[in-house]
From Swiss-Prot:
Gene Ontology CC annotations of this record: plasma membrane
InterPro entries: KdpA
Lineage, highest ranks first: Bacteria, Bacillati, Bacillota, Clostridia, Eubacteriales
Organism: Clostridium acetobutylicum (strain ATCC 824 / DSM 792 / JCM 1419 / IAM 19013 / LMG 5710 / NBRC 13948 / NRRL B-527 / VKM B-1787 / 2291 / W)
PANTHER family associated with the record: POTASSIUM-TRANSPORTING ATPASE A CHAIN, POTASSIUM-TRANSPORTING ATPASE POTASSIUM-BINDING SUBUNIT
Protein's recorded name: Potassium-transporting ATPase potassium-binding subunit
GO molecular function: P-type potassium transmembrane transporter activity; potassium ion binding
Family from the record: Belongs to the KdpA family.
Bilayer-spanning residue ranges: 1-21, 62-82, 132-152, 176-196, 253-273, 279-299, 371-391, 415-435, 482-502, 528-548
Main location: membrane
Self-association state and partner proteins as the record states: The system is composed of three essential subunits: KdpA, KdpB and KdpC.
Induction: By low potassium concentration.
Protein topology in the membrane: Multi-pass membrane protein
Length: 557
């Protein structure tokens, strides 16, 4: 029954990707849709109000400049709001302003689509901050990621201009993110998720004691949290909290929605380059890696804790520590896998309580950072590996490698190599810094191998813009707030800049006709080769660190 539950969720996800991906293609290419009569007027009003010239096209440098400037302004405004949130506007619970280190971490976290939270949502942010800062950035960061991916695909398809960042940002928000979020938020409200501006309720329990029940505009935040692969929760318990994820049905919907746009982006890619088989090959590689991770995580958690088994305690129900009974092993394991496949970072169970092998799965997913990934940017990472795969295969047969009818030359490979190196460099160097400084070691709550995994997970999550964590880490300190913030920032924007440079280099090349000697990239052989290359590079890069963490912990149980 548990396997059937997982299968149904993933089948629904795949089926929904087809129409949503086609719709995203129409939005990106300004094709007609049913919503145009209404949304054209809304978009036009926004263009006039903000002075956007919608006909103006940008090259890759202009696109990046617009992106960076457009990200900088709300970051400054958001920082100010979090610092002064103690004022009485939409703050019925009298939440105090955040201190500077935590504010820096929070702004960078939500700006970069990471949503790493070193604060408790119900006590650390006012309603004003939750709506104006947190929810706004969830839309803004997701729209930015999708816009970059669309510009990336346009360049790969041979267009010299990448579009207009401001126009892309508006259209993605009004035509994709807002409609989906409204539908999902209404569903959540129907399932019992709160949506109110009332203050917290104090109730008398059956034991006769008083308990404070936190409330707030939860449903609206929860919808975009998953749709935009954001992951930050209204409550500190995130999607394990009954007010965020009350039923097995909402849990299934959350899994589907956090995968939906990331998977639909691949379908959109196939339409935009007019090569649907190419999209199928990429999608298949992602699904194989997803299924492998889900199978390993589920098996490890279902087997339970071997240390408890050896002392005679039954493990027939599996490892239920840190999990919600309403979701069970299947719902928790699948959520754990896909939330780190997609760089979402929402959690419906305590990752710190996973078995060593079960906990290694989300860690490795984020280290690879290619399995669907966050909305937009994760897809670009997979294309980066596809380019590298074609290049290596070309070397083996002695031919000039080609991808999408464009020759892959030294410039592209140097940029791709740099982009691949950035991710592990940020993870391993920052982890080494934390493990060799007094401030870093002070945050580790568990000694030995598990403590090392906590540190490794924190920086892997930050570099991958995921945001989930082994919450045993004491991370609300100046050291952890600043170091994680810097890693999140570099992990987001360095990748975007490098990969747009790669795409623009492809756009400048002439298309070459395919010949009998051309390595086909739209078949099973390519999919298998792509998976092997990803696994080999990931193992060569991260295996020593993983061996010192979860693998060593498993061997010592």
């Amino acid at each position: 029954m548990e396997i059937l539950q997982i299968a149904i969720i993933l089948i629904v996800f795949v089926l929904l990707c087809i129409p949503i991906g086609r719709y995203m293609y129409k939005v990106s290419e300004h094709k007609k849709t049913l919503l145009d009569p209404v949304l054209d007027k809304i978009d036009g009003f926004i263009y006039k109000l903000s002075g956007i010239q919608k006909e103006e096209e940008m090259n890759w440098k202009q696109y990046i400049f617009a992106l960076l400037m457009c990200n900088a302004v709300p970051a400054i405004i958001g920082y100010i709001i979090l610092r002064i949130q103690a004022v009485g506007i939409f703050n019925p619970n009298h939440v105090k302003g955040m201190e500077q280190g935590l504010t820096f971490n929070t702004i960078i976290s939500f700006l970069t689509n990471t949503n790493l939270q070193d604060y408790a949502g119900e006590t650390g942010a006012s309603y004003l901050s939750q709506m104006i800062v947190i929810t706004f950035f969830m839309f803004f960061a997701a729209a930015t990621g999708i816009a970059v991916a669309l510009a990336f695909i346009r360049a790969l398809s041979g267009k010299k201009k990448l579009g207009n960042f401001y126009v892309d940002l508006v259209r993605i928000t009004t035509r994709i993110l807002l409609p989906l979020s409204i539908i999902v938020a209404i569903f959540y409200i129907g399932q019992g998720v709160p949506q109110t501006l009332s203050a917290n309720k104090t109730v008398t329990t059956i034991e006769g004691k008083l308990q404070n029940i936190p409330l707030g505009p939860v449903a609206s935040l929860e919808a975009i949290k998953l749709i935009g692969t954001n992951g930050g929760g209204f409550f500190s318990a995130n999607s394990s909290h009954p007010f965020e994820n009350p039923t097995p049905l909402t849990n299934s919907v959350q899994i589907i929605t956090l995968l939906l746009l990331a998977g639909s982006m691949v379908v959109c890619f196939g339409h935009m380059i007019k090569k649907k088989k190419q999209a199928v090959a990429i999608f298949a590689a992602m699904m194989v890696l997803l299924l492998a991770g889900a199978a390993i995580c589920f098996s490890a958690e279902k087997a339970g804790n071997p240390a408890l088994s050896r002392i005679g305690l039954s493990q027939s129900m599996g490892n239920l520590e840190g999990k919600e009974e309403r979701f069970g092993i299947a719902g928790s394991s699948l959520f754990t896998t896909v939330t780190t496949d997609t760089s979402c970072g929402a959690v419906n169970n305590m990752h710190d309580s996973l078995t060593p092998i079960g906990g290694a799965v989300p860690l490795i997913n984020m280290m690879l950072n290619v399995i669907f990934g966050g909305v937009g940017v994760g897809f670009m990472n997979m294309i980066m590996y596809a380019i590298l795969t074609v290049f290596l295969c070309g070397l083996m047969v002695g031919r000039t490698p080609e991808f999408l009818n464009k020759k892959i030359e030294g410039k592209e490979i140097k940029l791709v190599a740099f982009a691949i190196i950035v991710h592990p460099f940020l993870i391993l160097m920052s982890s080494a810094l934390a493990l060799t400084t007094k401030q870093g070691l002070a945050g580790i709550s568990n000694p030995g191998f598990h403590g090392l995994t906590q540190v490794l997970y924190q920086f892997t999550s930050s570099a991958a813009n995921n945001g989930s964590g082994f919450e045993g880490l004491i991370d609300n300190t100046m050291f952890w707030n600043v170091s994680a913030g810097v890693v999140m920032f570099l992990g987001r924007y360095l990748s975007i800049i490098i990969l747009l440079a790669v795409a623009s280099s492809f756009a400048a090349k002439r298309a070459v006709p395919a010949t009998q000697g051309t390595f086909k990239t739209d078949n099973t052989i390519f999919t298998v080769t792509l998976i092997v290359i990803i696994v080999i590079i990931g193992a060569l890069t991260f295996l020593p660190a993983v061996a010192l963490g979860p693998i060593s912990e498993y061997l010592t149980l």
